Amino acid sequence: MLKLVCAVVLIATVNAKGSSPGFGIGQLPGITVVSGGVSGGSLSGGVSGGSLSGGIYGGYPRLYGGFGPGGVYGSINSFGGVNTNAYGLYGTSPAVRGAAQGAAATSVLGILSGVPSRISGYSVGTGGGRAFVSGSATPIGGLPYGGYGYGGYGYGGYGGYGYGGYGYPDIAYYGGSTYGNIASGVISSPTSGVSLPYGGILGLYGGYGGYGSGYGGYGMGSAYSIGNYLSGHGGYYGGSYPSYGSTLTGVSQSLSFGRAIMSGQAFGAGVPAFGSVNFGNFGVGTGGIGILGGGGVIGSGGVIGGGGVIGGGGVVGGGAVIGGGGVIGGGVPTGGIIRKKKY
């Protein structure tokens, strides 16, 4: 049986203050997500004055082209890892590039929750072209924000980006919302005075084996997780010339009441990425959207359920430690090694 691996390409472009001819409509650049396709498949056309073309082969995206002054792209699957890349955000600090990626990744988490959500997060430069990124997506309706809390990290302890030689901490924030499959918000940095609006439509398309097409994440076959397989670039664009790109790697986690959080480390400012990181099996399921049920924390592929810690293929259940084919059950100790004494 084929396992579902649903790869998604994510583009989130940003325009600096004001609008530029050919760079979108007003100040709102585009965000586009494309996934699915067993082999072949391509998307070409204009989104806010830009174009995307290329094919998706075996679920792994190939991306060419770009939008306006810069963009963010990545992949999404069921393994619970985060990997997005930014390029073309010239003149921005690692924290700003990390925030752009965090906003895009967290917006996807909000879209996948299936309800309108608030997006919130921050990015802090840690020196050497790196930044720590954290954020959350929370359904609108009076629930408190999920996430890690600003106070716990102590901005003063991080190395600054060194604007003007003074070593001010490199900090950037992002905030916005999602509605249906539309995302919008603003990225801002008090250190550099940058304000970057973002927004657009996220289109989510189906996966393998009859999972079909989905709108807003339903029937998509992947839960709250940003993927980890992305070929190419690694902090460089066009091969040998640095474009001040960056790569974000990390993990995402679903919480109760439809909330989700993500955190990771962004590498940027022309510093090559240190390879892709697979944060596999982070307790995020492989299907469905809910917390209880297939693909949630409890359910098929989740922490408890078929393929999870407890259930078929897990620690307790068929094919695992306890259950058919496992240590205890229709496998080795019971019905395998132990025999009835014949008289």
Swiss-Prot record:
Record localization: Secreted
Where is it mostly found?
secreted
Q: Which range is the signal sequence, renumbered to this chain?
A: 1-16
A GO cellular component term found in this entry reads:
extracellular region
Highest taxon of the lineage:
Eukaryota
Q: What InterPro entries has UniProt attached to this entry?
A: Trimer_LpxA-like_sf
Known tissue expression: Prismatic layer of shell (at protein level).
Q: Is Endoplasmic reticulum tagged as a keyword?
A: no
Keywords of the record, alphabetical order, are: Secreted, Signal
What is the name attached to this protein's record? Shematrin-like protein 3
